[in-house]
Amino acid sequence: MSTYTRPVMLLLSGLLLLTLAIAVLNTLVPLWLAQEHMSTWQVGVVSSSYFTGNLVGTLLTGYVIKRIGFNRSYYLASFIFAAGCAGLGLMIGFWSWLAWRFVAGIGCAMIWVVVESALMCSGTSRNRGRLLAAYMMVYYVGTFLGQLLVSKVSTELMSVLPWVTGLTLAGILPLLFTRVLNQQTENHDSTSITSMLKLRQARLGVNGCIISGIVLGSLYGLMPLYLNHKGVSNASIGFWMAVLVSAGILGQWPIGRLADKFGRLLVLRVQVFVVILGSIAMLSQAAMAPALFILGAAGFTLYPVAMAWACEKVEHHQLVAMNQALLLSYTVGSLLGPSFTAMLMQNFSDNLLFIMIASVSFIYLLMLLRNAGHTPKPVAHV
């Protein structure tokens, strides 16, 4: 059976359009707020509202999928995000945008949970790594193209909102031509997110998603600041961030394939070790291009491999709940990691960015090494 079936390809095609819209808005909303002369704390609160919506959307989506299936859940998530986009143009103000970004955050998280869950339910333990790698490649390519669009088109609010909303609705079209089956049966009791977080045999996967959130959140949010403080120009900062993200894109497919072939545990150990090496290279002021490249290739691929690891440990009907738990773990890591790291950087040194990344990666490596010797046979999903 082919890994990339027709439903999978159409699902990823729709996701690409949605990711473009998400990337454009996430870049421009803080700039629009600044143009309206809102204070820094107001910009921060609006951003927090979006991420709070992410958490709420993550918690709700499992119930929605169980009630109406993958296709309708995907349509609903897209409509919610489109409403969050269009609503920004109805009234420009702090409280209004606070509410609409919360709505957009819910829709965005629902899209992620639906797509990730559909891919995991479509795959088996033999090809799930490649499916999630394809998902991450589409996500990063969409993010990259979104940034490119921002640099090429008008960024005025009322110029952007119509085509971004249209792009979001266009993301629904591919799914109209296929049906993604929800193979969870009603014979099983509903599985809670809490029970998935407590599942002992999946703990390395859950912890891996938290670590991935800390690493990626810190790199995305604080690397530009680190480079700026080193005297790097804005144009050069864009180049180095492109190197980082490009490495993540290029690393997805080969690492996903290696994880399917040689096992997730071995690949996770190597990835985390390489993240530590990349962090040390950045601290030692070595050649920045290779250091950033290996950091991006290893760091940006942690999430899908850790996710695939955790999903091997559960029954098929538990996959959606497990995916919610993993996305929730990643979100918590991506919120707490940059906040704590930024505080350390402000009070001590900018080098704490890479010391923090290396430290949490080393802790995770110790967890992975403790699992040496005997690894339970994964649950087979056919």
Curated annotation (Swiss-Prot):
Disulfide bonds: none annotated. NCBIfam families: PRK03633.1 (NF002962). It comes from Escherichia coli O6:K15:H31 (strain 536 / UPEC). It is a multi-pass membrane protein. This is Uncharacterized MFS-type transporter YcaD. The keyword Transmembrane helix applies. The gene is ycaD. GO terms for molecular function: transmembrane transporter activity. It is found in: Cell inner membrane. PANTHER family: TRANSPORTER MFS SUPERFAMILY (PTHR23521:SF2). InterPro entries: MFS, MFS_dom, MFS_trans_sf, MFS_YcaD, MFS_YcaD-like. The chain crosses the membrane at residues 14-34, 45-65, 79-99, 102-122, 131-151, 157-177, 204-224, 235-255, 270-290, 291-311, 325-345, 348-368. Keywords: Cell inner membrane, Cell membrane, Membrane, Transmembrane, Transmembrane helix, Transport. Signal peptide: none annotated. Belongs to the major facilitator superfamily. YcaD (TC 2.A.1.26) family. Its main location: membrane. It holds the Pfam family MFS_1. It comes from the Bacteria. GO terms for cellular component: plasma membrane.
